[in-house]
Amino acid sequence: MLRFKSRNKEYVFDQPVVMGILNVTPDSFSDGGKFNEIDTALAHCETMLNEGTAIIDIGGCSTRPNNAIATESEELERVIPVVKTIRKHFPEAILSVDTFRKSIAEACISEGADIVNDISGGLFDDEMLPFIGKNHIPYVMMHCVGTPETMHQYKLEGNIHQTVMDFFKNQHKKIEPLGDQQIILDPGIGFGKTIESNFALLSNLEEYRFNGYPILIGISRKSFIFKTLGCTPQEADNGTTVANTIALLNGADILRVHDVKKAIEAITLTSHL
């Protein structure tokens, strides 16, 4: 079950939910350039909300392989206007900011974002976890290795479940003294792992469900899907739905996706099993 508090509200979901991806970048691997204007971003947000997404995840810094990382000022200029505009037009929407920078997270939270989705799990910015911990902000802690520039060079093998669990434990120790936290775990499927390791993480979520925290699975159009199927990222929506269904059957609490409608259908059907 997913439960968290934000902006003096408590949110409780008794079944898995969708986190819809809103990339306001010119260079994201799947949808770069589509929604980096305020009007197109707002329209896409409205579409995803109408399709049933529970959370909108706003990202302004692409971390695709072999891509130059946006500067802090570039990321800030991309995400803040979008957070402000969406919060104004959809005051009840749950907003997440996809960033590994504490400064961006803090700025977005002050403008009405609810969740920080950190692909580094606090690894890339030493100020992130203290900020999250002191303010008890809902926080997606993703497993990651290396740096923004090198993380895709890794291909972790072996006991991947234990590797991911150890990472969660170590990062959690850094904020545990600051009181109860609102952590959501993300195993980082597609980040520094072999295709076999990605499937292993997808098929046995309970092996790394640390402390009973909810688990987010973000596999939408990832390379382990389209490489296995021999298709392009844009052609991988059917494969994504199959993989998301596997995740749901294994206990996923949040699906982070580009195509909200297909994910909602997967949740609806699996809820009858």
Predicted segment positions?
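Active-site-adjacent loop and "lid" segments of alpha/beta metabolic enzymes
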Residues: 6-7, 13, 30-39, 43-44, ...
